[in-house]
A protein has these predicted regions:
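Terminal-appendage/accessory-domain detector
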Residues: 1-175
Length: 175
């Protein structure tokens, strides 16, 4: 990939994002525990670039790659992209845009990779279902057999969320 093929030549990694992300999860300070790491955009991006995935273990104090992730994290610069902020607050869009690119030691820049609506965004919820199922089955494994987890997943998908929510509201409103 773009990162692994050129990582020795990377001087800086630039992430353009919206203001709330900059304010809430950009964290260049020392990360002293899993909660700190889980709330650091720089940590998450570094781990994803190096290991191609992020799991709950990625945030643990005993994670084998923590030093490598922290070293790469120091090369990351997070900046606000005003257009991303505008699109984040625009009700008809509610984009959660991010763009990443690399500045190399020779001063050149990589191609920019931009995502306006990540998987899980309301505009892409259906795309998230296979990933959510995989995660559900994997995390249910210690408690359920695979077949049981799959059956439970299928039953969850059959729930009529709207009517269930309305029923809950009626109960809360004493109707």
């Amino acid at each position: 990939g773009l990162f692994n093929d050129n990582k020795k030549d990377i001087h800086e990694i630039i992430i353009e994002t919206h203001e709330p992300a900059l304010r809430i999860i950009s964290n260049k300070k020392d990360l002293n525990n899993s909660s700190d790491r889980d709330h650091s955009l720089e940590y998450m991006v570094s781990a994803a670039l190096i290991f191609k995935e992020i799991t709950s273990d990625t945030y643990s104090d005993n994670f084998h790659g923590i030093d490598e992730v922290n070293a790469l994290r120091k090369k990351i610069k997070v900046i606000e992209n005003k257009e991303f902020t505008k699109n984040y607050y625009e009700i008809s869009k509610r984009h959660i845009s991010n763009e990443i690119y690399f500045k190399y030691k020779d001063g050149s820049l990589s191609i920019k990779e931009k995502v306006e609506t990540p998987i899980g965004h309301p505009n892409r919820r259906n795309e998230a279902v296979p990933f959510l199922k995989e995660k559900f089955v994997k995390n249910a494994f210690p408690y359920l057999k695979e077949e049981e987890a799959n059956n439970l997943w299928e039953n969850i998908l059959q729930i009529d969320i709207q009517s269930e929510f309305e029923e809950l509201l009626n109960i809360l409103n004493n109707d």
